[in-house]
Curated annotation (Swiss-Prot):
Assembly with partners or alone: NDH-1 is composed of 13 different subunits. Subunits NuoB, CD, E, F, and G constitute the peripheral sector of the complex.
Protein name per Swiss-Prot or TrEMBL: NADH-quinone oxidoreductase subunit C/D
Topology with respect to the bilayer: Peripheral membrane protein
Function summary: NDH-1 shuttles electrons from NADH, via FMN and iron-sulfur (Fe-S) centers, to quinones in the respiratory chain. The immediate electron acceptor for the enzyme in this species is believed to be ubiquinone. Couples the redox reaction to proton translocation (for every two electrons transferred, four hydrogen ions are translocated across the cytoplasmic membrane), and thus conserves the redox energy in a proton gradient.
Chain intervals for the UniProt region annotation (NADH dehydrogenase I subunit D): 208-593
Residue ranges, annotated region (NADH dehydrogenase I subunit C): 1-184
Species assigned in the record: Ectopseudomonas mendocina (strain ymp)
Annotated catalysed reactions: a quinone + NADH + 5 H(+)(in) = a quinol + NAD(+) + 4 H(+)(out)
Family assignment from sequence similarity: In the N-terminal section; belongs to the complex I 30 kDa subunit family.
Record bears the keyword Zinc: no
Chief place where the protein resides: membrane
Localization per record: Cell inner membrane
EC numbers: 7.1.1.-
GO molecular function, one term: quinone binding
Length: 593
């Protein structure tokens, strides 16, 4: 597909210095200080007093930073490796993205524990809303002027802020939990929706509005997800999405696992993405360690990641068509996924959650006969996609239910932090595999599928075409797989290559320490973004020179996509909401982490 409104993306700018010169010209030499990191972008420290001035300046530059990609915090109180950093008990960071520059920038603010207050950025980027709520929920940092600063991940009755360093990280550190009748009644009352809290009216001039709970247990909600609908008949006047039911504290867990042992936890973020979840994490750790993996590792990782892109998209396709009323296709798509899992299981030994990538490589080399299995799949799937398109996607009922439904443009998508197929369906040609190649994607030939209307139908068609492009990439891996080792020969490769452990005592000691305690990563910060199955996923890691991460920030695409729901669906029918939810392609584990 092509789009007349495609946005032109320039070559990727790593540590773009042009914006630094522009900011110095506008703000003066004392407007900010720079921090050296391995994030691949300029990192600026600004004072709280000048924060909004700097953010507004960046938002309105000639080539603006149109997307607030991420916003979160760090508890700095136990951090020991702080050379060159300002004094801070807590830090809040703003990760901004400019498509016109094809570069990112991070703004940081240092805060004292005695004064945890910042002005809200919701007037600059509307999607700052949920991010600021999460920072308040998990750190207790207040954003003055925020329209509704309440808990978002934790229950409304929760006490404390879980990502603080003085908050317990293990269940055994808490008192035993018991749910008394009084506690149950308290929780039920806390979950009651009150329209006035959200600025909603209970009725119009001549009628009362109905408030309907969709979820948290509803098949069309695609997980433990609640949306409170304000209805005038069948029309949605407004709605309030409520998340957090699937929150498992993944970022807190990362602080108590070694760099190596956290890999299986990444599989459970987007639990349909498999090793696609491992990729940004191990790439970020490898940046910290300074590891350059062999070409064979890059190709193996890309091949398996694209297999999981296909399995995720096949599940999306079947459930999406089912959401709008067709029951049969979901059985076919699940059968087709089984063919892909046959290949994945033969290579990795597992199906949904292989946890197969390693720091510096992969768990083991490709098995004998892998090429035959891959070729059979590559030859078979394109014909199946043609059948789906002919039998289901050109169906007049499906098109009537989805064309023109839940439509938004590129500007709106960027304002809300939308990435992936949801952004490309508006005509914006931005795919990290092309725009900012990682893990060897620059060696592959493939197209970036686009559409023009940004509606529910286009989002589906973009993903179908993405599966065809994934097949192209896998086929190139099959035909051009390099020879060589499946692990880097580096001291921090984990587990290290075992072949020399019986000959060299130093290698044996390294192997023992890294398997038992885990590798010690150099102090610093690194970030890796990838084009995951549902949009852009990234890991922002802070190392304090230990065997465990000091701070692991997991930015998922689905969190941003659900925040956009009210702005898109107001004025539509309830049936349109169901089609819209299906077209987003989300899982709540990816939202709630």
């Amino acid at each position: 597909m092509t789009a007349d409104t495609a946005v032109s993306i320039p070559p990727y700018q790593v540590d773009d210095q042009d914006v630094i010169a522009e900011l110095r010209a506008r703000l003066g030499d004392d407007g900010f200080t720079l921090q050296a990191t391995r994030t691949g972008m300029p990192v600026l420290w600004v004072s709280r007093e000048r924060l909004l001035e700097v953010l507004k300046c960046l938002r309105h530059l000639p080539r603006p930073y149109v997307m607030l990609y991420d916003l979160h915090g760090v508890d700095e109180r136990l951090r020991t490796q702080r050379r060159g950093l300002p004094d801070a008990d807590f830090t809040v960071f703003y990760h901004l993205m400019s498509l016109e520059r094809n570069s990112d920038l991070m703004v940081k603010v240092a805060l004292s524990e005695r004064d945890l207050n910042l002005p809200t950025a919701t007037g600059i980027w509307p999607n700052a809303n949920w991010y600021e709520r999460e920072v308040w929920d998990l750190y207790g940092i207040t954003f003055q002027g925020h329209p509704h600063l309440t808990r978002i991940m934790m229950p409304p009755t929760w006490e404390g802020h879980p990502l603080r360093k003085d908050y317990p990280a293990r269940a055994t550190e808490f008192d035993p939990f018991s749910l008394t009748l009084a506690k149950q009644q308290l929780e039920e009352e806390a979950a009651r929706f009150r329209p006035e809290d959200w600025g909603m009216k209970r009725g119009g001039e001549h009628e009362d509005y109905m408030f309907l709970n969709l979820g948290p247990n509803h098949p069309s909600a695609h997980g433990a997800f609640r949306i409170i609908l304000q209805l005038d008949g069948e029309e949605i006047v407004d709605c309030v999405p409520e998340i957090g039911y699937h929150h498992r504290g993944a970022e807190k867990m990362a602080e108590r696992q070694s760099w190596h042992s956290f890999i299986p936890y990444t599989d459970r973020i987007d639990y349909l993405g498999g090793v696609m979840n491992n990729l940004p994490y191990v790439l970020a750790v490898e940046k910290l360690a300074g590891i350059k993996v062999p070409d064979r590792v890059d190709f193996i990782r890309v091949m398996l990641a694209e297999f999981f892109r296909i399995t995720s998209h096949l599940l999306f396709l079947g459930t999406y068509i089912q959401d709008v009323g067709a029951m049969t296709p979901v059985f076919f798509t699940f059968t087709d996924r089984q063919r892909a899992y046959k290949v994945i299981e033969a290579i990795t030994g597992f199906r949904l959650h292989p946890a197969w990538y390693r720091i510096g490589g992969v768990a083991h080399d490709l098995p004998r006969g892998w090429d035959k299995l891959v070729k059979e799949f590559v030859d078979w799937l394109p014909r199946r996609l043609d059948e789906y398109e002919k039998a289901a996607l050109k169906n007049s009922i499906l098109k009537a239910r989805t064309i023109g439904v839940a439509q938004y443009n590129t500007k709106e998508a960027l304002e809300w932090g939308t990435t992936g197929a949801g952004l490309r369906a508006t005509g914006c040609d931005f795919d990290l595999r092309k725009a900012r190649p990682y893990s060897g994607y620059e060696h592959f030939e493939f197209e970036v599928p686009l559409a023009a209307n940004g509606d529910a139908y286009d989002r589906c068609m973009v993903r179908v075409e993405e599966m065809r492009q994934s097949i192209r990439i896998i086929d190139q891996c099959l035909k051009n797989m390099p020879e060589g080792p499946y692990k880097a020969d580096h001291p921090l490769t984990t587990p290290p290559p075992k072949e020399r452990t019986l000959q060299h005592i130093e290698t044996l000691i390294t192997h023992f320490l890294q398997v038992s305690w885990g590798p010690v990563m150099p102090a610093g910060e690194a970030l890796q973004m990838i084009e995951a199955t549902k949009g852009i996923n990234s890991y922002y890691l802070t190392s304090d020179g230990s065997t465990m991460s000091y701070r692991t920030r997991i930015r998922t695409p689905s969190f941003a996509h659900l925040q956009q729901i009210p702005s898109v669906i107001r004025g539509s029918m309830v049936a349109d909401l169901i089609a819209y939810l299906g077209s987003i392609d989300f899982v709540m584990a990816d939202v709630d982490r």
